[in-house]
């Protein structure tokens, strides 16, 4: 069975650029620095519902 995936959205433009498997043990929202192809730079991406 495949794991449910959650989206990581850019905090600047709001685009959902990345999808990661959901971890039920993690209660806080995931925050990572990733490259946003729409902004053209590295920005903070946060887990969305």
From Swiss-Prot:
A family per Pfam: Ribosomal_L33
InterPro entries, sorted: Ribosomal_bL33, Ribosomal_bL33_sf, Ribosomal_zn-bd
Top-level lineage group: Bacteria
UniProt keywords, alphabetically: Ribonucleoprotein, Ribosomal protein
GO biological process: translation
Coiled-coil annotated spans: none
Record's keyword annotation contains Ribonucleoprotein: yes
Molecular function in Gene Ontology: structural constituent of ribosome
Keyword field contains Ribonucleoprotein: yes
Signal peptide: none
Entry's Gene Ontology cellular component terms: cytoplasm; ribonucleoprotein complex; ribosome
Protein family: Belongs to the bacterial ribosomal protein bL33 family.
HAMAP family xref list: Ribosomal_bL33
Name of the protein in question: Large ribosomal subunit protein bL33B
């Amino acid at each position: 069975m495949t794991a449910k995936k959650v989206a990581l959205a850019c905090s600047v433009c709001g685009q959902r650029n990345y999808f990661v498997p959901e971890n039920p043990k993690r209660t806080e929202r995931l925050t990572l620095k990733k490259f946003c192809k729409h902004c053209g730079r590295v920005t903070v991406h946060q887990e969305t519902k």
